Amino acid sequence: MNKKTIITALLALVSLGASAQLESVKELKMKSEYFNHERQVLIYTPAGYQDFDQTYYDVIYVFDSQDRAKFDLVHCLTNLIPLDENKHFLVVGICSPSSENYFRNADYLPVPIHAKDAESSRGRFSDERAYGHSADLKKFLKHELMPYMTTNYRTSGRNIGIGHSLSASFVLDCMVSDDMFDDYIAISPNYCYDEYRLYNDLEKYPWMNHKEPRFIYTSMGAEATSWDPYWQKGWQQASTFFSDRSHFPANTFVSVQQFPGYEHNPGYLPSLTEAMNEYLQFSTSVLQQHLSQETYPVHIELQCENMKGDVYITGNQEALANWNPKGVKMNQVNDSTCSVDLQLHLPAYFKFTRGDWEHGANILNAEPGNLIIHETEPTTRVYRLWNLIPWTGEDTK
């Protein structure tokens, strides 16, 4: 590449950077048939979301997002952790209302089932406004919020739940009762409520029946030794259970962490940082190796103003030549388009090349790195080359 081309490319990158869509947070109020009040929701989209129309995003659901710092920290960390700089997420914050008629606890606690003497067994949760609507929140998620995200955003189909304290308990309860999410991050959860109900449910859950890859993270700060004996016992039981690999299938990744130098709220920062680091490792290793047993038809097109020379596609399975850079040769449709029809296991990870790794495609409408097809729809995927420098390593003079 000559000096003139390099200068032109740098100027073009500056121009693109100036015009690219920035990260954004949308505030939404949703009516729900399960609540008498509107549900406030925050939706974060990463930079370039509008431009990268062939990138589909995993969705992180963050509970207790009425504490805005919890929500903001999640999407900040997804950009700052350097393990996979091209892995970005949609982040959805679920805000609990704060009013004299509805407490935050009501979102996350089920009605006690072990209550003989209501006042003594419910303790500080004795007020009826302070518990009992967790089943309604699950219905809101499953039947209203998640379908809204699927309809209005490009989602990959993989969902992660993150909670702290009572909302962490709720996230784990979503797993044992509904398999609501694919992956779970529970920071400082309450395992002792209602006579250790959550821990007992975790013990009974049929872990070995779950065949898909799953990430589970749970942690505790100084509460593990400084809070009341019931809380300490709940954590001791749960952490011992989660630490025993014999309870889980091989493709379930479980992490148990302690942060004894941090109290309940300050512990959210170091714990979430550790959780996101571990999750990105899981995402870029385990998830990429797990393929569906079935194959699905996919029509893939690559477009450019002047499509000259041979083009190959290669990726993470036999139908994509198992990352051989001179993999599957694409068909030349016309001067601006080449295409290929394949039967692929999902998720499919792939790249376009000129036949070697020194000449890879610069894709304009997808995030850099591996291109990914997660879902069976749409069956046609159209990628566009950057017209100025469509291929790395080629002189465009």
What does each model-found stretch correspond to?
Residues 22, 297, 327:
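Beta-strand-rich binding-surface signature
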Residues 1-5:
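Positively charged n-region of N-terminal signal peptides that target proteins for export
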Residues 296-304:
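A short, amphipathic beta-strand motif
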Residues 306, 378-397:
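Compositionally biased low-complexity segments at domain edges in trafficked proteins
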Residues 21-293, 309, 314-319, 333-338, ...:
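Non-catalytic cap/lid and distal C-terminal segments of serine-dependent acyl enzymes
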